[in-house]
Amino acid sequence: MQDIINPIDRALLKAELTKEKRLRSTNKSKNEIYIVTAHDSPNVMQEIGRLREVAFRYYGGGTGFPVDIDEYDTMEDAYRQLIVWSPEDEQILGGYRFLCGSDVKFDENGKPILATSHLFNFSEKFIKEILPYTVELGRSFVALEYQSTRSGAKGLFVLDNPVSYTHLT
């Protein structure tokens, strides 16, 4: 198992979190939601990979590498990263990687290039009629210092919804 990289300098992260990448503010806590890619925000991607590896190792998973970043994060038409940023703490609270079904590319055999492709045998009907209207979400994480034992990875949802939740399933 390799050591996890040190945190990325906050000035580098802030420089890449530009207004063009800002989706909106959260409903609570004055946090900000951004959408980035490894190509337009390489330092943010490194920090995402670091935080994912920290969180996943804590729960007995992880890649064993210095960061949790794979080919789906870095390929030409890479998955996008939705992150919650705390301007007050100047750090990433958590995030998801995602790909809209309408943006899915296909390999030379017509198979969708998705992180989950090895798990399913997608029918032609599914690919044509359903896939374009889906979103593949994955690699969700909440930075350890922002996790609660009650909400876990669902804490990102709760951060942005003003309704009081006792539990989510």
Question: What would you call each of these model-derived segments?
Answer:
Residues 14, 19-21, 28-30, 105, ...:
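Context-gated lysine
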Residues 2-39:
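Conserved N-terminal entry element of GNAT/NAT acetyltransferase domains
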Residues 150-162:
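Conserved acetyl-CoA pyrophosphate-binding loop and the N-cap/start of the following alpha-helix
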Residues 48, 162-163:
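Conserved short hydrophobic patches within well-ordered secondary structure
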Residues 166-169:
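Conserved small/polar residues in nucleotide/adenosyl-binding loops
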Residues 34-149:
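A conserved beta-strand-loop-helix scaffold within acyl/acetyltransferase catalytic domains
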